Amino acid sequence: MGKGDPNKPRGKMSSYAYFVQTCREEHKKKHPDSSVNFAEFSRKCSERWKTMSSKEKGKFEEMAKGDKARYDREMKNYVPPKGEKKGKKKDPNAPKRPPSAFFLFCSEHRPKIKNDHPGLSIGDTAKKLGEMWSEQLAKDKQPYEQKAAKLKEKYEKDIAAYRAKSKSDAGKKGPGRPAGSKKKAEPEEEEEEEEDEEEEEEEEDEE
């Protein structure tokens, strides 16, 4: 899937991401021993960015252009590892794996973060969502956990019905098929479902 490929070029940074990076460095120099409240820090960065002139933003926009050129150049020479996402065909009728409580939380809050912090990179958005989730009280997490539990319960019923139907269909189509091969299909289906979940997260991050 390429997520762990160490040779894949680092993603390009936006002008706002460079600005936030600069703000972090300034904060570390002024307050080397103090910890950063990420939510408060991001809010201040966003407010400061909105009041900056085009001339002040120009430096960061030039940095972003340079990084985009670097990224485009590296991507031209990048060759993905062989055999990625090949081999198994996914059944479009297979039930999708349910999202976790954290994933439901991210889906709800990501649009607001993008609106409040335009230009924030995918990595910084994910980090902010993670910190927001960890700051939530147990009672605030409960609605997401309850919804995730219901979706998981529904998925388990759906996947059981799907597998029963798949075995029934396989029995009709291939009477000469070895009995042991049916059991082998189940782990593969589980692997496919895990890939589906990872791909959904990647797609949502890239929106």
Curated annotation (Swiss-Prot):
GO biological processes: defense response to Gram-negative bacterium; defense response to Gram-positive bacterium; DNA geometric change; DNA recombination; inflammatory response to antigenic stimulus; innate immune response; regulation of transcription by RNA polymerase II; response to lipopolysaccharide
Localization, UniProt: Nucleus; Chromosome; Cytoplasm; Secreted
Disulfide bond keyword on record: yes
Modification after translation: Reduction/oxidation of cysteine residues Cys-23, Cys-45 and Cys-106 and a possible intramolecular disulfide bond involving Cys-23 and Cys-45 give rise to different redox forms with specific functional activities in various cellular compartments: 1- fully reduced HMGB2 (HMGB2C23hC45hC106h), 2- disulfide HMGB2 (HMGB2C23-C45C106h) and 3- sulfonyl HMGB2 (HMGB2C23soC45soC106so).
GO MF annotation, one: four-way junction DNA binding
Key words, A-Z: Chromosome, Cytoplasm, Disulfide bond, DNA recombination, DNA-binding, Immunity, Inflammatory response, Innate immunity, Nucleus, Oxidation, Repeat, Secreted, Transcription, Transcription regulation
Disulphide-bridged cysteine pairs: 23-45
SUPFAM superfamilies xref list: HMG-box
One term under GO cellular component: perinuclear region of cytoplasm
A Pfam family hit: HMG_box
Residues within the DNA-binding region(s): 9-79, 95-163
Residue span of region Disordered: 52-102, 162-207
Domain of life: Eukaryota
Function: Multifunctional protein with various roles in different cellular compartments. May act in a redox sensitive manner. Associates with chromatin and binds DNA with a preference to non-canonical DNA structures such as single-stranded DNA. Can bent DNA and enhance DNA flexibility by looping thus providing a mechanism to promote activities on various gene promoters. Proposed to be involved in the innate immune response to nucleic acids by acting as a cytoplasmic promiscuous immunogenic DNA/RNA sensor. Involved in inflammatory response to antigenic stimulus coupled with pro-inflammatory activity.
Name by which UniProt lists this protein: High mobility group protein B2
Organism: Gallus gallus
Taxonomic lineage: Eukaryota, Metazoa, Chordata, Craniata, Vertebrata
Gene that produces this protein: HMGB2
